[in-house]
Structures are given as C-alpha cells and as structure tokens.
Amino acid sequence: MASQKHSRGHGSKQMATASTYDHSRHGYGAHGRHRDSGLLDSLGRFFGGERSVPRKGSGKEVHMSRSGYLSSSPQRSPYHAHGRHVDDNPVVHFFRNIVSPRTPPPSQPKRGFSRFSWGAENHKPYYGGYGSRSLEHHKSSYKGYKDPHREGHGSLSRIFKLGGQRSRSSSPMARR
C-alpha cells in the first residue's frame, strides 16, 4: 500500500516538474506558471494515478478525478473523451499550447505523434523516446532566453531582433 502511494506520488512529481520546466522555458514566466500550476498538478495526478490505481481495482478515484478535470476545463475534452481518449486529450492540449506559439506548421503532425508516443512510452522509455526530442527543441529556445552569449538563438528573440533592427533600417516604405 505504501509503495503504491509512493510510486504514484513520484510519478506525478516527475510529470509536474517536467511540465513546469517546459512552461518556464517558453518564457511564460511566473504569471503563466501560477495560472497553470493547477492544470499541471491535475495532469500529474492524472498520469500518476492512471498508471498504478486501476490495477488494484480502485478505479473510482480515477473516475472522480477525470470528471473533476473535465468540468474544470471544458475545452474539447468532453467531446472526444469517452474513456480511452481522456488521458490523451490533456496531453494533446498541453502540447498544442507549447508547440503552436513557436512553430505553427509542425504542430499538427506532432500533435498526432505525441498522442501515440506518450501513450506507448508512458512507463520509462519516455525519456529516451519523445522526451529527448522535445528537450532538444526546448533547449534551443531556452538558451535564447537565458544565455547572454547566445541571445540570437531563441526563435522569439531572433524575430524581435531581426524585426526591430531591419524594419527600422529598411522599412517597406524605403524599398519602394
């Protein structure tokens, strides 16, 4: 009993910290982190509980958390969610929020891919499989925000720098 609780708590901590890292890396800052902390915690509990609880036969806890989660965020989850997709949809929603501000075109293939890979690699290979790729993605933007030597590497800072300098020197009016 104690080990079951321990593993569930550990799993939710891992998920929550990973998710919070993703948010802070994208520069949402304290405002975004505060607002999403409830969502991240529920996501962490979601996956942490999803892994170990149903095996023991106490699925009532999971259903209660599911219904609570669905009612708290009435986006598209209630539409698609009829059992199996419930645990996929928060992930899809989460990745959509992370991926779309930076790179809108690849968000669609990644959305479908993240669904399958996260479902398949939910146990431990998650770090080696999809996690490594997403971390590489985040590292590049993270360096742009934090590292003063590589300020031009983050996509947002690159846009602002290029747009800020070039739009003043060679504006569309000057070209014509």
Curated annotation (Swiss-Prot):
Residues 1-176 are annotated as: Disordered. Residues 134-153 have a biased composition (Basic and acidic residues). The modification N-acetylalanine is found at A2. InterPro entries: Myelin_BP. This is Myelin basic protein. The modification Deamidated glutamine is found at Q108. Keywords: Acetylation, Cell membrane, Citrullination, Membrane, Methylation, Phosphoprotein. It comes from Xenopus laevis. It comes from the Eukaryota. As in other animals, several charge isomers may be produced as a result of optional post-translational modifications, such as phosphorylation of serine or threonine residues, deamidation of glutamine or asparagine residues, citrullination and methylation of arginine residues. It holds the Pfam family Myelin_MBP. It is found in: Myelin membrane. Belongs to the myelin basic protein family. Is, with PLP, the most abundant protein component of the myelin membrane in the CNS. Plays a role in both the formation and stabilization of this compact multilayer arrangement of bilayers. Each splice variant and charge isomer may have a specialized function in the assembly of an optimized, biochemically functional myelin membrane. The lineage of its organism: Eukaryota, Metazoa, Chordata, Craniata, Vertebrata. One of its GO terms (molecular function) is structural constituent of myelin sheath.
